[in-house]
Amino acid sequence: MEVQKNPSMMTMLIPWITFWIAVSVNTEKGSVITLLVASAIPFIMRKHKFVIWDQLSIVAVAILSAIASLTGAGDISTDIGYLVFGLFWLVSCLTKEPLCAAYVKYNYGGEAAHKNPLFMKTNYILAAAWGVLYVLTAVWTFLLKKAGVGATLIVVNNLMPVLMGIFTGWFEKWYPARLARGSKKQ
């Protein structure tokens, strides 16, 4: 039997990204495409271990896609999707392992990373930041659509995660180094 690879955040992200793009472009066809992608993820990513966030994401995206398909309310479904995704990140901060740590801990000794306070603190901060970003994304998406400037969302909702990804890459190096040097009050 083949040994499974470590979890990949792509397992969680592929259904969400497909959902936000496909349902935004065409609610009816996009929701069907998203359901097909979500149902294929366990096969596509079969060589990787799954974590709870992968499983919850597949279920949440499938439910939101079904709602969009049945009601034609793609806008509301995608807005709720941003909220749910953000809440996943925030709720994970109430557990022993923030969402991002479930994936990146394997780069830092696996389960042993939980004993590293710098690793854990950094990941709790990043999980909270991603959670806040997506909860705010749900809010501004709803408000901008109501204000009639929904076209702006194409730029904003794609740019913000890119900027947050750049920030994450910087922060995960800078923050632990700063704490290790003792130059940050705790």
Mark where each language-model region is.
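Short, amphipathic, aromatic/basic-enriched membrane-interface segments that mark the entry/exit
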Residues: 1-8, 24-29, 45-55
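Alpha-helical transmembrane segments of multipass membrane proteins
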Residues: 16-21, 40-44, 63-67, 139-143
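Structural signature of hydrophobic alpha-helical transmembrane segments
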Residues: 20-37
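Membrane-interface helix caps and helix-loop-helix hairpins in membrane proteins
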Residues: 25, 48-51, 69-76, 151
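C-terminal ends of transmembrane helices
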Residues: 38-49, 172
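Cytoplasmic-side transmembrane-helix entry/capping segments in multi-pass membrane proteins
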Residues: 51-62, 77-84
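Membrane-proximal helix-loop-helix units in multi-pass membrane proteins
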Residues: 72-121
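C-terminal membrane-adjacent module
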Residues: 109-186
